[in-house]
C-alpha cells in the first residue's frame, strides 16, 4: 500500500521548533483514487463527482442515483424532511449508525476507498489531529437536492 506524504509546517513550541504534518490531498492523489471510487459509484448506480477542497479534504458529491439515501437515513420523519430539503453531509466516522439498506452498503465501500493510503494518528486528548487528509461525502446540496432515479 502506498502511503502519501502530507505537507508539513514548522512551529515554535516551548523555545524549540517542531515539525507538524498537515492534512494534504493533491490533484495527483485524487486522480489515483478516482478510478476505484468511480467504479464503486457505477456498481451502485450513483452519479457523483470527486473534488479537492482547501488542499486538505477529498470530497465526494453524490448528485443522483438508484439508492434511496433519504429513505435509508435516520429514524425520524423530521430528520428525513431536513435531508430532502438540505441534503445530507455524511459523517464518515459514524455513517454505520445513521444509514441502513443500500445506502449503508454503498458508504461501506466508498468511504474506505476514499481513505486508501490515509492515516489517522490523532490524539483527541490533547486536541492534536494528524491525518493524511480529511474526507467528506455530500448527498445532494442545499440548493440542489439528491435526485432519486427509478
Residue ranges, per PLM feature:
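Charged, low-complexity intrinsically disordered tails and linkers
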Residues: 1-15
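Catalytic phosphate/metal-binding cores of nucleic-acid and nucleotide-processing enzymes, i.e., regions
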Residues: 13-19, 23-40, 44, 54-56, ...
Amino acid at each position: 500500500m502506498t502511503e502519501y506524504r502530507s505537507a508539513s509546517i514548522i512551529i515554535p513550541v516551548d523555545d524549540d521548533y517542531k515539525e507538524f504534518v498537515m492534512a494534504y490531498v493533491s490533484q495527483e492523489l485524487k486522480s489515483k483514487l478516482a478510478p476505484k471510487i468511480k467504479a464503486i459509484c457505477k456498481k451502485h448506480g450513483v452519479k457523483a463527482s470527486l473534488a479537492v477542497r482547501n488542499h486538505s479534504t477529498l470530497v465526494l458529491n453524490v448528485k443522483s442515483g438508484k439508492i434511496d439515501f433519504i429513505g435509508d437515513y435516520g429514524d425520524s420523519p423530521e430528520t428525513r424532511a431536513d435531508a430532502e430539503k438540505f441534503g445530507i453531509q455524511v459523517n464518515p466516522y459514524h455513517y454505520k449508525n445513521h444509514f441502513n439498506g443500500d445506502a449503508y452498503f454503498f458508504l461501506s465501500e466508498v468511504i474506505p476507498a476514499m481513505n486508501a493510503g490515509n492515516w489517522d494518528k490523532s490524539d483527541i486528548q490533547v486536541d492534536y489531529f494528524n491525518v493524511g487528509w480529511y474526507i467528506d461525502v455530500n448527498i445532494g446540496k442545499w440548493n440542489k437536492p439528491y435526485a432519486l432515479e427509478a
